[in-house]
Amino acid sequence: MTQLKKLYRKLSSLPAIAGLLLISASWAWTQAPAQPPQTDTATKPGASQPEQDQKRATGNASTQEQKISSKEAEELFRDVDDILRFASKDSGLPIKKEVKRRLTSRDEVVAYLEKTMAEDKDAQRLRRSELVLKKFGLLPRDFDLQTFLVALLREQVAGYYDMKTKTVNLLDWIDIEQQRPVLAHELTHALQDQSFGLEKWMKEGDNDLENKKQPTGMDIENDEISEARQAVVEGQAMVVLVDYMLAPTGQSLLASPQIVNALKEGMLVGTADSPEFKDAPVFLKEELTFPYRYGLDFETELLRTGGKEKAFAATLSNPPRTTRQIMEPKTYLSGESLEPMRLPDFERDFKNYERFDVGAIGEFDVAILVDQYAGTEASHNFYPHWRGGYYYAARPKGDPSAPLALLYVSRWASREKAAAFAAIYAQSLDKRYKHVHAVAQEGKDTLDDLQKLESLSGTHTWLTEEGPVVIDVKADSVLITESLDQPTTEQLEQELFGAFVATGK
């Protein structure tokens, strides 16, 4: 559906995002149930100014920003070892070496993150992501993704564990009481790193199709590995964070489902002090919080069914491969294997086009798309029926200003679900294009009133200001092309759906 994978991989390479982007949205909750375990602490200069502390915790810069004292910094440095021991006991992951620690300023962190973003090899992927996302209607056409991310970094920057230097970075502008639960989360990453080599472990799932001339069905199947692994890493860290916050009450994550639900709800809402996140498009909120929300649910289910060993070390040794396995842990536990998707001959079929992007459209991607165009309830009822999907984006050769052309193929659990998804996608056209007109077909009603559609079968075409949109539904599969010339669309239909046409299915 977009380069979703590559967009998230790009974001997750930034430590502050991978660390605690969403934690700032849950400060209200983390302060409510209990104070975290702690050593004796001196009174903080900012303790009588909770509103200011809250603002600092979410990362909003202020000309009056207060710094923690040298005594508080020393105390926080000592706390690292205590919290590391808690994280080790809670996760079962051993402490193999001391974790380096460093106190850093907001300016240093922001400069580091901006440098990482500018130099990262995925910078071009990010720009491609933006255009494909806009084609699917998941970002407004005038939205500047790069500007948004820079602003978000400044707003949401938080403490983080740096996998390259093996150092946990503590922040000199956030009250130490608020940094302790952050440390529980980040030191879990340090433990993961010590046992499994986190940077290499994540790269093993970094499956980029950009340089493959002819991706295979297995390539598409493996295209979500990085998201699934990120959800495991963040889900485990969230388990430890929740248990750390609940420890003074004698409770734990498994015994407090209502608290977990409240935390997850808060992740998507943000706070009054996080305007960039609060005002972000739905897609970005969902995408940025996916590994935390769904990762937490995934790990909770593994804890419930298999205990600590299964939820932590065993899952890091044998990680899930798709967002479907994260969203539906039973599919991971049962070892479900879906048949790879059939792919066309991209080089031949798109001989008149320059490839722009290609990738999987997984269960989570579909959940966001359906949520945006049919609502959250419909999304929750719909995404479990996903059985595969991919997209291919291209531009006509010699015409870089031409609209982005798109092929999207999806497979569903039944004919009925395929027909229902096709209708939802057709309904999105009115929201994504200024002018949409159904092409009359002999013997068929003209589908101009898209919002009345409940299901769609057969082949249908609409004209838009960016060219034709074709939706072809055959059995349990849906083929969609946008801004693609008719001969290419017909060739793709014949290649992928020829067997259905021949048998009349």
Predicted regions, residues:
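Compositionally biased, proline/threonine/alanine/serine-rich low-complexity intrinsically disordered stretches
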Residues: 29-74, 505
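Catalytic Zn2+-binding segment of zinc metalloproteases
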Residues: 187-203
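Auxiliary, metal-adjacent structural segments of Zn-dependent hydrolase domains
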Residues: 77-168, 172-177
